[in-house]
Amino acid sequence: MQALVHDPESPSSLRRAEVPDPVPAPDEALIAVAAASFNFLDLAYADTVHGVGAVPGEDAAGVVVTTAADGSGPPAGTRVASFAMGGALAGRRAVATADLGVVPDGIDLVTAAALPAAGVTALRAVRRLGTVLGRRVLVTGASGGVGRFAVQLAALAGAHVVAHVGSAPRGAGLRELGAAEVVTDLDGVAPVHGVVENVGGPLLTAAVTLLAEGGVALSVGQASGQPSTIDFEAERRHGGHRAVEVFTVDTGYAGFGGDIEELLGLVAAGRLDPQIGWRGSWDRAVEAAEALRARKVAGKAVVEIGTV
């Protein structure tokens, strides 16, 4: 089958190649991939996450062509969206059935491919904040894939969302997604109950100081590539009643399929916008990757792989 493989010597470390079809494990279904989307992890940490020749990508949507040998999961012919580490940017993908969500009628597979990794990450992060109804929630990196989902999902849960972006142009459209405030600086921002922090570095440090008593800041990502310094002695003197957590989407992992279907349901109901900022053939995958890396994509970049 054709696939995009990791090659550090190629532009954006991506090269089109012929690779063997994946062989599914007993609990995995084989899907014909129609579309896949890029995530920051696929690009920023490609050289450490993927070996040379490996197929990257976490998100793919397509049609089941071979059901799981153990009898789990949807039957052949079912349209699905999938979330797993690696293997998305190819004509075929083997995925554990627990990580498949059935795509409802009326949602195209390009839209479905934009949801899994960023959407599930945002959904689980907002849940971790607990009850946010009527509370203030700060989302940093709000113009990115996870950020745009977090803004929408926190707003849907009743939060007063403060969206932080790196520049005023990056904030375009965020109020329409549910942000009550869009800021480029945290100076003057009132205290918040929770933080979905996607940038890291000094921004995480500053965000922690905004937490109200009992609040929590979730370190979801480090798009800045910079380390963060937290003054724990200052926190003790503050009272120690606020927390900073390293957040990972697979904490308490029990399969991603249910969350994918929840997100798809919100899209079908017109309550969630997948925010696809780039869409095109996978022949243009390098273009998509470079635009995403340069922060020129508002939201998700999706490549169309096959017609299924």
Name what the model sees in each region:
Residues 44, 80-141:
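NAD(P)H dinucleotide-binding glycine-rich loop of Rossmann-like/cofactor-binding domains
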Residues 20-37, 45-87, 198:
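Glycine-rich beta-strand-centered segment in the early N-terminal region that forms part
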